[in-house]
């Protein structure tokens, strides 16, 4: 979204089993106002899938793999950014979002497998989305919607080659 830099850090990705979910984490972030995703694993397939979508559907979104997550967090904070870790063990989203929303540079950590305990100490905010086990994709979507206060629905995706024409029935797209 305009003026804010939101980037996802995906940790714990297992290439042999998490490709679809990690791709959907990136695409959800892209659609809901994130600028890009750092992937703390090597998976060129995920990176290429995400970049292909960004190329066709427009907008500025990067995806980089082989990121060392501890270094990424350290560098992000050194550059003045804040870190929000999505977890079912944090402070409930409605109780902390007003504190997070003013952050102009935000790294959102989304785990796949069990997240190392040190993440809770590295994060500026440990954010629970319901405090119940569910999808990391749903957590990211709800978090970004609350963070952007619904403004992501009016987002523009410059450079798109295709766009959807809203319709009550059927699928309508337009080549640009």
Swiss-Prot record:
Disulfide pairings:
none
Write out the annotated subcellular location.
Cytoplasm
Binding positions (S-adenosyl-L-methionine): 86, 111-115
Which molecular-function annotation in GO is an example for this chain? tRNA (cytidine(56)-2'-O)-methyltransferase activity
Q: Which reaction does it catalyse?
A: cytidine(56) in tRNA + S-adenosyl-L-methionine = 2'-O-methylcytidine(56) in tRNA + S-adenosyl-L-homocysteine + H(+)
One GO term under biological process is: tRNA nucleoside ribose methylation
Q: Which UniProt keywords apply?
A: Cytoplasm, Methyltransferase, S-adenosyl-L-methionine, Transferase, tRNA processing
The enzyme's first-digit EC class, named in words, is: transferase
Name the Gene3D superfamilies for this protein. Answer: 3.40.1280.10
GO CC terms? cytoplasm
Major place of localization?
cytoplasm
Similarity-based family: Belongs to the aTrm56 family.
* Quaternary structure and interacting proteins, as annotated: Homodimer.
> What task does this protein carry out?
Specifically catalyzes the AdoMet-dependent 2'-O-ribose methylation of cytidine at position 56 in tRNAs.
What name appears for this protein in its UniProt entry? tRNA (cytidine(56)-2'-O)-methyltransferase
Q: Which organism is it from?
A: Methanoregula boonei (strain DSM 21154 / JCM 14090 / 6A8)
């Amino acid at each position: 979204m305009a003026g804010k830099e939101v980037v996802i850090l995906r940790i714990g990705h297992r290439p042999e089993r998490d490709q679809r979910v990690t791709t959907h984490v990136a695409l959800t972030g892209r659609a809901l106002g994130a600028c890009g995703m750092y992937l703390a694993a090597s998976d060129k397939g995920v990176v290429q899938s995400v970049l292909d979508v960004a190329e066709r559907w427009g907008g500025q979104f990067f995806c980089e793999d082989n990121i060392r997550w501890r270094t990424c967090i350290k560098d992000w904070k050194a550059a003045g950014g804040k870190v929000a870790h999505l977890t079912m063990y944090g402070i409930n989203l409605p109780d902390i979002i007003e504190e997070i929303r003013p952050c102009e540079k935000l790294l959102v950590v989304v785990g796949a497998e069990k997240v190392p305990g040190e993440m809770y100490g590295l994060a500026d905010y440990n954010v629970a989305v319901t405090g119940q086990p569910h999808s990391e994709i749903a957590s990211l979507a709800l978090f970004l919607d609350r963070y952007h206060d619904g403004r992501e629905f009016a987002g523009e995706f410059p450079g798109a080659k295709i766009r959807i024409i809203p319709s009550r029935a059927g699928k309508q797209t337009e080549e640009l």
